[in-house]
C-alpha cells in the first residue's frame, strides 16, 4: 500500500448528467481530500512506521463495514483490533483520524469558497442569501434605493461572539490549518509554474508534519482573558477589514441602484453592522469574570483596534504622497498639516502626509492614555483624542478635501475603509454585554435593601411588594449602599463589576458596554432589580435617563410562555418606560434556545420560541415600543443552530423589523469567520436575511390557522414524549452519565466556565452546552429530534382525516415548519444508531440499558420515517446534496474515533486512573467535535 487510504474518500456521488458544475466541484473536492490524505498518510508512515499506517487503514475499513451494513462480524473484528492495541498505538490512531477530520474540513471549506467564487463571476445570477439577490428582490417589489437607505439608517445587525466551550481546537492548531487553507487556495487562484507547484506541496507537507507534532489539546485550562485573546484573533482574520468592506459594497450597490432610478445617492450609508461580545462580560455561572477581568477585557479590545488604526494610518501616510502644487487642500487639512510633528524637509510640500502624521501622533497619544503598550513607533507629544468621533472627524476632513479637489478615487481606497472602521468599532472594538443570573441580582438587592431598610426581609416579599419597593428605589436620589456596612463577598464583587462598567463608559464611550442581560428572567422584579443596581453606579439616573439597556433573557418553556405578560406589565410602569424612552424607545429581549430545548425538547422549544415572538410583537406594538430580539442560538440544532439565513427569514412577521442580534458560539465562530472569504459571506448572509425578513417577509401570507393549531398539538405531544424520557423515566440520569462523555468533558481545558450550575447529577442543573455536546459525541444527537416521531404518530392517529398529507402541505407552505424539519434532517443525518448502541454498552445495569436504549432506538427510527414522509424524501439530506456529500466524505474517518472513544471510556472507568487513557479520551472528543463541525 503506497499511501494511506485517507485520500480515497467514499464512492463518487451520482449527479445529473447535465450538472457539470456539481460534478466538477465534486471532483476538485475529492482531489483536495486525496492530496491532503496522501500527505497525512505519508507523514504517519514516516513518523510512526508502516505498522501504525496499516493499523489505521484496517480500522477504517472495518468501521465502514460496521457502519454501512451493521455487520456483526465487523463489530467483533473492531472490538478485537481495539482490545489488542497498546495505549501508545491508540493515541496515534486517534491523532491520525482526528487530523484527517481537520484536513477534510479545510478541503471542504476551500470547495465552498470555490463555489462561492464561481457564483460571483461577472454575469452570474446572484445567489440566494446574499445581498445582491435580496436587493434584486427588493427592486422587484418596488422598493427604491432611497427606501433601502432609510431602512439601513435605523437597522442593526449584530453577531455576538461568545466563549461557550465547544471549540476544542487550540489556536496553534488553527493557525497551522489556516496556512494549509491558504496553500490550497493558492493552487486554485494562481497559475503556478512546475517549480511553484512542487514548492506548494512541499510547504503543505511541512505544515501537515508540524500539525502532527503539535499538541492537539491544551495542557492547562483557559482563563477568561485567554478566551478574550482567542476571540480577538477573528478580528484580525476577518472583522476589522470585512465589516467596512461590506458597508462599502452595499453603499456602492445602492448608489448604482439610485442612478438607475434617475435619483441621487445622498450621503453615506449608515453603519448598521456592529460586532458584539460576551467574552469577559458574561458572569452567569462563571465566577472568574470579575471587575478586574472586565477591565482587562476592555483594555485588550481597545489595544487590538487602536493598533489596527495606527497600522492603517501608517499605510495611509505612505499612500497619500500628493504634492501641494498638484493636489489642492482645504483649509482644515492645511491646519492639520501645520500641527504635524513631522519636520522632514522631504514632506514639507506633502500636506496630506503631514496631516496623517499629525493624526497618527494624536492617536498614539490616545493609545498611551488608554494603556496600550508596545506601540509601533514612538511619537512626539500630542493631544489625545477625546473620542473616536473626534478621530474620525479629522479623517472626514481629509476625505472632504480629496473629494473636493478631484481625488475622489483616492478617497475611496484605504481612507474610506478606515473611516468606516472607526464608525463601526470606535475605541472599544466590540460592544461587550454584561450578563448575570437573576438569582444573583436578587441576592445582591436583598442584602442591600435589608441593610438600608431594616426589617424589609426582601427575600420573603411577594412579586407585587418587590415591584413597589424597587420602583420607589428607582425614584430615590440617595445611595442604597453605605461605606459603613460590611457586605458579602458576592455583593462586593457584583457592585465592583457595575462600577467598572461605569468607568468603561467614561473611558471608551457608552458603546463599550451597551447591554446588561438578566439570565433566567422570571418576573418584572428581575428587571427592576438590575435597574436599581445600575442606578447605584450612575448608569441609570433617578430622573429616568439610562446609559445602558436592561435586557431580559427568557430561557425555559415556562418563562417563554410568560414573557409577553411580563413585558406588558414592565412597559406599563412609568418609571421603567422613561428609561426605555431615553434609549430611543427600543427594548431588547433575548430568547434562549439552549435551556428551552433541554427543558422541553426540540419541537416544543422551537414552537414556544415562535409563539413568544408573536406575543412580544403584539405587546410592543400596543405600547409603541420598538422590539429588538436577541437570539441566543448555539452551534448545534439542539441549541438553536442551523443555517442563519433560514432561521432569520423563518421568523414571524414583525419579529426582525430591521434589528437583530444573534450569538455566534464556540466552534461555529471558527467555521464561519476564520477564513476571510467565508467570513465575508456569513456577514453578508446576516445582513441579507435581516433585510429580507424586515422589508419583504411581511408581504407573505400569515400561517394558516389550521397549521398553528396542528403545531400546538404536535408540540404538546412531543413535549410529553421528551419529558417522559428525560425527566420521568427511572434510571435515565444514570443512563446519560454512563453512556456519554459528560464526566470526561469537564476534564478538557476548553473553557473557563464550569459544566454544571450546581454539583449534582440532575439534568435540571446541567448546563445546556455540555448536555448537547455529550449527546453529539455519542452520535445520538438526542436534543435535536427526540419526541418528533411519537408526536407525529399520535397526531396522525388522532387526525386520520388530515393525515400525513396535511403535514406535507404544512411543510411546503410554512417557512417555520420547513426550517424546523430541515434542521432535524441535518442533525439526524449526523447521528448513527449503530455507533450509539456501542455507547449504550457502557451502561452496566443491563435492565436500564435495554429499557432506555430500546425506547431511544424506536423513537430514532420513527422520527426518521415520519420526517422523510413529510418532506417527501427517499433518504436524509436528499434536499441538501452539498451536506450529504460532505458527510459521505468525512464520516468514514469520524466513525473510528467513536469506536476508539468507547474502548477508552470503558478502560478509563473500570481501571485505576491512567493519565494517558484520559488524554486519549480527550483526544477523541477533539476529533469527533472537529468531524461533526457543529456539536455544541
Curated annotation (Swiss-Prot):
Function: Forms oxaloacetate, a four-carbon dicarboxylic acid source for the tricarboxylic acid cycle.
InterPro entries to which the protein is assigned, alphabetical: PEP_COase, PEP_COase_bac/pln-type, PEP_COase_Lys_AS, PEPCASE_His_AS, Pyrv/PenolPyrv_kinase-like_dom
Reaction equations catalysed: oxaloacetate + phosphate = phosphoenolpyruvate + hydrogencarbonate
Known EC number: 4.1.1.31
EC primary class: lyase
GO cellular component, one term: cytosol
Active site: 164, 598
A Gene Ontology biological process term: oxaloacetate metabolic process
Family listed: Belongs to the PEPCase type 1 family.
GO molecular function: magnesium ion binding; phosphoenolpyruvate carboxylase activity
Record keyword Magnesium present: yes
Cofactor: Mg(2+)
Gene3D superfamilies the UniProt entry points to: Phosphoenolpyruvate/pyruvate domain
Protein's UniProt name: Phosphoenolpyruvate carboxylase
Keywords carried by this UniProt record: Carbon dioxide fixation, Lyase, Magnesium
Amino acid at each position: 500500500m503506497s499511501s494511506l487510504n485517507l485520500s480515497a474518500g467514499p464512492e463518487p456521488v451520482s449527479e445529473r448528467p447535465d450538472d457539470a458544475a456539481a460534478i466538477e466541484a465534486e471532483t476538485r473536492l475529492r482531489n483536495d481530500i486525496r492530496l491532503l490524505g496522501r500527505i497525512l498518510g505519508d507523514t504517519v508512515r514516516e513518523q510512526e512506521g508502516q505498522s501504525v499506517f496499516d493499523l489505521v487503514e484496517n480500522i477504517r475499513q472495518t468501521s465502514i463495514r460496521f457502519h454501512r451494513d451493521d455487520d456483526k462480524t465487523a463489530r467483533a473484528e473492531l472490538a478485537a483490533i481495539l482490545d489488542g492495541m497498546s495505549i501508545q498505538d491508540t493515541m496515534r490512531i486517534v491523532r491520525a483520524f482526528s487530523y484527517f477530520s481537520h484536513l477534510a474540513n479545510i478541503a471542504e471549506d476551500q470547495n465552498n469558497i470555490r463555489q462561492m467564487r464561481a457564483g460571483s463571476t461577472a454575469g452570474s445570477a446572484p445567489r440566494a442569501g446574499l445581498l445582491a439577490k435580496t436587493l434584486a428582490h427588493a427592486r422587484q417589489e418596488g422598493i427604491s434605493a432611497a427606501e433601502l437607505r432609510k431602512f439601513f439608517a435605523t437597522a442593526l445587525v449584530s453577531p455576538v461572539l461568545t466563549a461557550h466551550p465547544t471549540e476544542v481546537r487550540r489556536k496553534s492548531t488553527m493557525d497551522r490549518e489556516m496556512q494549509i487553507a491558504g496553500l490550497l487556495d493558492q493552487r486554485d487562484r494562481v497559475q503556478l509554474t512546475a517549480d511553484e507547484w512542487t514548492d506548494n506541496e512541499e510547504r503543505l507537507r511541512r505544515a501537515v508534519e508540524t500539525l502532527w507534532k503539535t499538541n492537539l489539546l491544551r495542557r492547562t485550562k483557559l482563563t477568561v482573558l485567554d478566551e478574550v485573546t482567542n476571540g480577538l484573533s477573528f478580528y484580525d482574520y476577518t472583522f476589522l477589514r470585512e465589516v467596512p468592506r461590506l458597508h462599502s459594497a452595499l453603499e456602492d450597490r445602492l448608489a448604482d441602484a439610485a442612478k438607475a432610478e434617475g435619483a441621487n445617492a445622498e450621503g453615506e450609508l449608515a453603519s448598521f453592522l456592529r460586532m458584539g461580545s460576551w467574552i469577559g462580560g458574561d458572569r452567569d455561572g462563571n465566577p472568574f469574570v470579575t471587575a478586574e477581568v472586565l477591565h482587562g477585557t476592555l483594555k485588550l479590545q481597545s489595544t487590538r483596534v487602536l493598533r489596527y488604526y495606527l497600522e492603517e494610518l501608517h499605510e495611509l501616510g505612505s499612500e497619500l504622497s500628493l504634492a501641494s502644487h498638484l493636489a489642492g487642500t482645504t483649509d482644515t487639512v492645511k491646519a492639520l498639516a501645520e500641527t504635524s510633528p513631522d519636520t522632514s524637509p522631504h514632506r514639507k510640500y506633502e500636506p496630506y502626509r503631514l496631516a496623517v502624521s499629525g493624526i497618527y501622533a494624536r492617536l498614539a497619544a490616545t493609545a498611551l492614555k488608554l494603556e496600550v503598550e508596545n506601540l509601533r513607533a514612538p511619537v512626539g507629544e500630542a493631544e489625545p483624542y477625546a473620542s473616536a468621533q473626534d478621530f474620525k472627524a479629522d479623517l472626514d476632513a481629509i476625505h472632504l478635501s480629496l473629494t473636493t479637489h478631484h481625488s475622489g478615487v483616492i478617497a475611496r481606497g484605504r481612507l474610506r475603509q478606515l473611516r468606516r472602521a472607526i464608525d463601526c468599532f470606535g475605541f472599544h472594538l466590540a460592544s461587550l454585554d454584561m450578563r448575570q443570573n437573576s438569582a444573583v441580582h436578587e441576592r445582591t438587592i436583598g442584602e442591600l435593601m435589608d441593610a438600608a431598610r431594616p426589617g424589609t426581609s426582601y427575600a420573603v416579599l411577594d412579586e407585587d411588594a418587590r415591584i413597589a419597593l424597587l420602583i420607589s428605589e428607582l425614584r430615590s436620589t440617595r445611595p442604597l449602599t453605605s461605606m459603613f456596612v460590611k457586605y458579602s463577598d458576592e455583593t462586593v464583587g457584583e457592585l465592583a463589576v457595575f462600577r467598572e462598567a461605569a468607568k468603561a463608559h467614561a473611558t471608551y464611550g457608552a458603546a463599550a458596554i451597551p447591554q446588561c442581560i438578566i439570565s433566567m428572567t422570571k418576573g418584572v422584579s428581575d428587571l427592576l432589580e438590575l435597574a436599581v443596581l445600575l442606578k447605584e453606579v450612575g448608569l441609570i439616573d433617578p430622573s429616568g435617563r439610562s446609559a445602558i439597556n436592561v435586557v431580559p433573557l427568557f430561557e425555559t418553556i415556562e418563562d417563554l410562555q410568560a414573557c409577553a405578560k411580563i413585558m406588558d406589565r414592565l412597559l406599563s410602569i412609568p418609571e421603567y418606560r422613561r428609561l426605555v424612552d431615553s434609549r430611543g424607545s427600543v427594548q431588547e429581549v433575548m430568547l434562549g434556545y439552549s435551556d428551552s430545548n433541554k427543558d422541553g425538547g426540540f419541537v416544543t422549544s422551537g414552537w414556544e420560541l415562535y409563539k413568544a415572538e408573536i406575543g412580544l410583537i403584539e405587546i410592543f406594538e400596543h405600547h409603541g415600543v420598538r422590539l429588538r430580539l436577541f437570539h441566543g442560538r448555539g452551534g448545534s440544532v439542539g441549541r438553536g443552530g442551523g443555517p442563519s439565513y433560514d432561521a432569520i427569514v423563518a421568523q414571524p412577521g414583525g419579529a426582525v423589523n430591521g434589528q437583530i442580534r444573534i450569538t455566534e458560539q464556540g466552534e461555529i465562530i471558527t467555521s464561519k469567520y476564520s477564513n476571510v472569504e467565508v467570513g465575508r459571506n456569513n456577514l453578508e448572509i446576516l445582513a441579507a436575511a435581516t433585510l429580507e425578513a424586515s422589508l419583504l417577509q411581511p408581504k407573505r401570507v400569515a400561517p394558516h390557522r389550521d397549521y398553528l393549531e396542528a403545531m400546538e398539538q404536535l408540540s404538546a405531544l412531543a413535549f410529553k414524549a421528551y419529558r417522559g424520557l428525560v425527566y420521568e423515566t427511572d434510571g435515565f440520569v444514570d443512563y446519560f452519565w454512563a453512556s456519554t462523555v459528560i464526566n470526561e468533558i469537564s476534564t478538557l481545558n476548553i473553557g473557563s466556565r464550569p459544566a454544571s450550575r450546581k454539583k449534582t447529577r440532575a439534568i435540571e442543573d446541567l448546563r445546556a452546552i455540555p448536555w448537547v455536546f455529550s449527546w453529539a459525541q455519542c452520535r445520538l444527537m438526542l436534543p435535536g429530534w427526540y419526541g418528533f416521531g411519537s408526536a407525529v404518530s399520535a397526531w396522525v392517529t388522532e387526525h386520520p382525516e388530515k393525515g400525513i398529507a396535511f403535514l406535507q402541505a404544512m411543510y411546503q407552505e410554512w417557512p417555520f415548519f420547513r426550517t424546523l424539519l430541515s434542521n432535524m434532517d441535518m442533525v439526524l443525518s449526523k447521528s448513527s444508531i449503530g455507533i450509539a448502541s456501542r455507547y449504550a454498552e457502557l451502561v452496566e445495569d443491563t435492565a436500564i440499558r435495554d429499557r432506555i436504549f430500546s425506547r431511544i432506538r424506536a423513537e430514532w427510527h420513527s422520527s426518521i420515517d415520519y420526517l422523510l414522509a413529510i418532506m417527501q424524501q427517499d433518504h436524509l439530506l436528499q434536499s441538501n446534496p452539498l451536506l450529504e456529500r460532505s458527510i459521505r466524505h468525512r464520516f468514514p474517518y469520524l466513525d473510528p474515533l467513536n469506536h476508539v472513544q468507547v474502548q477508552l471510556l470503558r478502560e478509563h472507568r473500570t481501571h485505576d486512573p491512567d493519565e494517558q487513557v484520559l488524554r486519549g479520551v480527550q483526544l477523541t472528543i477533539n476529533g469527533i467535535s472537529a468531524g461533526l463541525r457543529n456539536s455544541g
